[in-house]
Structure formats: C-alpha cells, structure tokens
Curated annotation (Swiss-Prot):
The gene is SPL8. This is Squamosa promoter-binding-like protein 8. A motif (Bipartite nuclear localization signal) lies at residues 243-259. The keyword Transcription regulation applies. It is found in: Nucleus. It comes from Oryza sativa subsp. indica. Probable transcription factor that plays an important role in building the laminar joint between leaf blade and leaf sheath boundary, thereby controlling ligule and auricle development. GO terms for cellular component: nucleus. Zn(2+) 2 binds at residues 227, 230, 234, 246. GO terms for molecular function: DNA binding; zinc ion binding. Residues 261-273 have a biased composition (Basic and acidic residues). It holds the Pfam family SBP. The keyword Transmembrane helix does not apply.
Length: 416
C-alpha cells in the first residue's frame, strides 16, 4: 500500500512529463556540447535539404565519421525533426532525447549504457559528479636556456666585482667547469694551481717560484731553467753562469743597447762648424748692407758735385760774357746768341750726369772744346766720389773754372 502513491506519481510523471530531468552526463563529443544547456548543435537538417537541392547527399559520409551508436542516434533524430523549417540553420535537442534514441536503437555498443544501468539500479547521475575530479595535466614548456648556460650565468654572477687582472663581465677561462682545467705549473711535481696567479704566469704555465729558480726539473727528468726573454724553459747549457736569460737572447739584448752613438768630439766639431757657418752668413749680410750704403753716399756726393759744377760753369760764362763785351762791343748780339747756346749745352751735360739722358744739341757741335771741358768735369766728379776730402774737390773745381775761362777767352780771340 505504501508503494501505490509512488507508483501513481511515477505514472503521472510518465503521462505529463513534469518530473525534473536528471543532469546530463559528460558527452563524448565535447565540441558539440560546449554551447549552453547541455544541448547539441545539429546542422544536418538544413544541410540535408541543401544537398538534396544540389543533387548529391553527404549524409552517409558524415554519419560514417561518428561511432555506430552516435550514427544511429543521429539517424533517429533526423527522422523525428524532419518537419522542421528548412530555413533553420541550427537545430538543438536535449541530450536526454539523444540518449533515449540511442537506447531505443539497441543497448549493445552504447557508450552510455553504464549510465542507463545505474539509473535502473536506483542511482542518479549525481553520483558521477561527486567523484573527485581528475587533476589537470601538467604541461612542460622547455626553456631556451640550457642547464649549462644557467650554471654559467650563476657562476658569472658570483664572479662579478673588482678582480685585478681579470675581466669581470664573464668568468675567466670559462670557469673551468665543463672539460676545462685550471692552468698548472709545468715543473715536475709542482702542479700549482695558477687560477689566482698573475696573467704572465698563467699564460706560460709556470709558477713564480720556478720562473726564478736556477734549476727546474721538467717533464722527462730534464734539468732546465726558465728564460725570461723567451718565456720558456731551456737546457742549462744555453745559459751563462746564473743568468736568467739564454745566451742568444741576451746577446741580442746587449747588441741593441750598445749601438754606436756619436762621440763627444764629433758632436762638438759639428757644433763648431754650424756656428762658423752662421757667423759667415751674418758677415755677408752686414757687408752687403754696407756696400749699399756706400753706393748711396757716393751717388749723393756725385749729385752735390754736379750741382757745384753747374754753379761754377754759370759763373764762368758770366765772366766770359763780360770779357767779350769789353773786347768787341759791336758784336754783342751775336756773342749773346753763342753764349746762350753754350749755356744750353752745359746744362744738357749736367742733366746727363744726374741720370737724365737728353739728345745732343747744336751747342755740342759748336763747342767741341766745351765737350772736353765737360769730360774733365766728369773725371773730376769721379775723383770727388773716390776722394772724400771736400777741400780737394773745391780746389779741383777752381782749376776747372780757370781753364774754362781761358778757353772762352781763346774762342773770342779766335773769332776776331
């Protein structure tokens, strides 16, 4: 009796369908169930009509891509919604209907048969969601920096700072971590670590002690010595006594230091010759300047003598005119004309002495004796330049004036 209401309720639910629909199980087609409500997206109906209009049908190929149960469900659903409008592009249907169609087609091979069996046993779909969710898969993205480079970067970070003799922006010698070994002394039995030694010792692989030792036993039991000129080990026979450099390189070094230098005597002789040449040049310059000054003084003296000569000639001609007037008063006009011509010739000659050449006039032809007098005056002018005595010049001018006066009187007598 207690089961009757429940049965009636179950029958009433079957008649009217008001009971709550259980939540849908997780779909095996996540692409089709992503959009809301748990419904699936179907475009088969519209595509079916379009394919029929175009003359070909792709439904078998599309159903072949689905599992057998899904293909059967899709065929059943296509049969149930064939009355839909051809203009509907998207068709939605609940998942429960999809499962019911699949169950009606046959439970064999249905991927959702375990859900239907659980429902028949009295359980619901909520038990599925109460299970602990699976952890999300961890995806590993490999980085671009390898482990070796990371170790190198960490090592470089520890090496930053002031380190004399090293470059601080990357570790020296690669850090000696991956197949590299620190430099060690090549002396037998030493093997000293040169990582913190000077750059010279690291480069030539010798510690400071063995680089200065007189005898070093190297590999093979050889007794050698480190040459500071060659920066390598030599046999003891190549060294002189306790020298730290081999015989050959030491001789080259001494030859460079003993290059021939100019002696002090030669240097002093060259200095003296240079001073003598300099003094001779200064003397030549002084002599040329004095010669130029002497020529200028002589030229001035010549001009002064020429001026005195012209004055004396004027005085002599005036005296000649007085004498001629006294001897021949009748021929005064002709005598004056001759005197003017003579005076013009004398002035012309005086201008020639001063450096102004003029063409010869008729006066030079009328008075050939006057040309001799002028030539005598030229010689007297040269004597004036050569003799610096002013009294001698004045006396010479007086004699020339007397000669000119006598010549003029002789000409007057010759005319008469």
């Amino acid at each position: 009796m207690m089961n009757v209401p429940s049965a009636a309720a179950a029958s009433s639910c079957d008649d009217f369908g008001y009971n709550a629909t259980p939540p849908p199980p997780p779909s095996l087609l996540p692409i089709m169930d992503q959009d809301g409500g748990g419904g699936s997206i179907q475009r088969d109906h519209h595509h079916h009509h379009n394919h029929q209009q175009l003359g070909y049908n792709l439904e078998p190929s599309s159903l072949a891509l689905l599992p057998p149960s899904n293909a059967a469900a899709a065929a059943a659903h296509h049969a149930t919604i064939a009355h839909a409008s051809p203009h509907d592009l998207l068709q939605f249907y609940p998942t429960s209907h999809y499962l019911a169609a699949a169950g009606g087609a046959g439970g064999g091979g249905n991927p959702y048969s375990h859900f239907t069996a659980a429902a028949a046993a009295g359980s619901t779909f909520q038990s599925y969601y109460q299970q602990p969710p699976q952890a999300a898969p961890e995806y590993y993205f490999p980085t671009l920096v390898s482990s070796a480079e990371e170790n190198m970067a960490s090592f470089a970070a520890t090496q930053l700072g002031l380190n004399l003799g090293y470059r601080t922006y990357f570790p020296p010698r690669g850090g000696y971590t991956y197949g590299h070994h620190p430099p060690r002394c090549q002396a037998e039995g030493c093997k000293a670590d040169l990582s913190s030694a000077k750059r010279y010792h690291r480069r030539h692989k010798v510690c400071e002690h063995h680089s200065k030792a007189p005898v070093v036993v190297t590999a093979g039991g050889l007794h050698q010595r480190f040459c500071q000129q060659c920066s390598r080990f030599h046999l003891l026979d190549e060294f002189d006594d306790a020298k730290k450099s081999c015989r050959k390189r030491l001789a080259d070094h001494n030859r460079r230091r003993r290059k021939s230098k100019p002696s002090d005597g030669e240097h002093s002789g060259e200095k003296r010759r240079a001073q003598a040449n300099k003094s001779a040049a200064t003397k030549d310059k002084a002599g040329s300047s004095s010669k130029n000054a002497g020529i200028g003084d002589g030229f001035e003296t010549q001009l002064l003598g020429g001026a005195h000569m012209s004055k004396d000639q004027d005085q002599a001609m005036d005296l000649g005119e007085v004498v001629k007037e006294a001897v021949d008063p009748k021929g005064k006009a002709s005598m004056q004309q001759q005197q003017q011509q003579a005076h013009h010739g004398i002035h012309q000659q005086s201008h020639q002495q001063h450096g102004f050449p003029f063409p010869s006039s008729s006066g030079s032809c009328l008075f050939p004796q006057s040309q001799g007098a002028v030539s005598s005056t030229d010689t007297s002018n040269i004597a004036q330049v050569q003799e610096p005595s002013l009294a001698f010049h004045q006396q010479h001018h007086q004699h020339s004036n007397i000669l000119q006066l006598g010549q003029a009187m002789f000409d007057l007598d010759f005319d008469h």
